[in-house]
Amino acid sequence: MNNFAKRIIPCLDVNNGRVVKGVNFVNLIDAGDPVEVAKIYNDSGADELCFLDITASFENRDTIVEVVRNVASELFIPLTVGGGIRKIDDISRLLEAGCDKVSINSAAIKNPNFIDEAAKKFGSQCIVVAIDAKKTDQGYHVFINGGRVDTKIDVFSWSKEVENRGCGEILLTSMDRDGTKSGFDNYLTGKVSKSLGIPVIASGGAGCMEHIRDTFLAGADAALAASIFHFGEIKIDDLKRYLRTQNIEVRL
């Protein structure tokens, strides 16, 4: 299989070591158990898995390391973990526990040198920069703190900067589309993707198979979604067969 196959990535929110926002699979014994959920996705054709650690309290940060350790032993597809990663030590611990990539967001904005340091120490292939984009009167801006704070930084110049600093991939979320199921922001995805030499993961807005096809046609290298997969609205193997009929290269 060539390296240009498009990737499908389910995303799970993990809070204090438990999957939240419900996962609705018929054959799932415990929908809150990350290991159970990861195994199902591993076996159902997902290309990668993404965990977003939304644990609020710092004292519980150790839980995500344990989760990664437990999940990694059962998982044969790459695992990316994001949420609250602020220090080189955070990355070391997660990679040692068995995760393949880490996703950094607010910390990259607050200290852009963190990207350079992380890429230099662990290699670009491990470092994903998550960009939460929202349309404003002044154009697309980068938002942080869960989409609450407008940094006033232009998304297109920031994505170029993080590439230059050594990140290996961008996770680009449209805050406007997130949760709407009305389709990805393909203008945003396409413009970022065409300006960069690194892969772009599109996120925010997936509601049907056509939406995922359209974001790939716009230039996304991977599509990330949550509820449409978790609630069984779209089965990944069905999605991949559909994409094949649309002449989009995927791994079956």
Curated annotation (Swiss-Prot):
GO BP, one annotated term: L-histidine biosynthetic process
Subunit details: Heterodimer of HisH and HisF.
Top-level class of the enzyme under EC nomenclature: lyase
Catalytic activity: 5-[(5-phospho-1-deoxy-D-ribulos-1-ylimino)methylamino]-1-(5-phospho-beta-D-ribosyl)imidazole-4-carboxamide + L-glutamine = D-erythro-1-(imidazol-4-yl)glycerol 3-phosphate + 5-amino-1-(5-phospho-beta-D-ribosyl)imidazole-4-carboxamide + L-glutamate + H(+)
GO CC term (a single one): cytoplasm
Protein location: Cytoplasm
E.C. number(s) listed in UniProt: 4.3.2.10
Name this polypeptide is given: Imidazole glycerol phosphate synthase subunit HisF
Main localization (coarse): cytoplasm
Pathway(s) of this molecule: Amino-acid biosynthesis; L-histidine biosynthesis; L-histidine from 5-phospho-alpha-D-ribose 1-diphosphate: step 5/9
Organism, as annotated: Campylobacter hominis (strain ATCC BAA-381 / DSM 21671 / CCUG 45161 / LMG 19568 / NCTC 13146 / CH001A)
InterPro entries reported in the protein's UniProt record: Aldolase_TIM, His_biosynth, HisF, IGPS_HisA/HisF, RibuloseP-bd_barrel
Record keywords, A-Z: Amino-acid biosynthesis, Cytoplasm, Histidine biosynthesis, Lyase
